[in-house]
Amino acid sequence: SVVDGFLVIRFQIGGSDRIGYMQPVGAGDFTPVLRHLEEDILAAGQRLRIIDMTPEGLEKLRSVGHCQFAFASDRNLEDYVYNASDLRDLPGRKYQSKRNHINRFEAEYEYRYEPMTRDHAAECMRLEAEWRKTRSGHTGELSAEQRAMQRAFEHFEELEMLGGCIYVGDRLIAFTYGSAVNDHTFDTHVEKADTDYDGAFTIINKLFAQ
């Protein structure tokens, strides 16, 4: 919802009953919005949790006199940041194992790469369902991811998504998609592959970066 000109996103953490909020998005100081979040979370009988704070957001929270927050970082939730050229070229010893995976994949399979469109949605969701069967636990998180994927495909063009698919024969074995954050940063939202095809994750990552 929009509160005092700021976009406020409320969600369930990890598919559990715990409620979290993203840092309010908008121009200027978001701290006046905190009282609305406090009222909302109090009605749910929980404590206020704000996830994915920016350094600037943290400083603003620290400056709010009436609020007391504990700050924590979870490395499991952090994103990886790569140079696009590294993903395209896989240079040096650092990426030797990835190059080995790709070489084995290319030697074993005849494949093709296709840019993703909304028309790939059904195949991608089927592959995601097969991938999910191999994962035990975290069912709430995986179900939330599945719902997010469905919504992304429903609004693929409006969200300006870009993606790619890899086929071996007529079988979809890997796909990925994401969107631009700004003119020099791209966020890969989803990357899935059939683990029966060794190197599928590595090659979809490389070809999409190209």
For each predicted feature, which ranges?
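Structured helix-beta-strand junction loops
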Residues: 44, 108-109, 159
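Accessory, usually C-terminal, subdomains that scaffold auxiliary metal cofactors
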Residues: 147-210
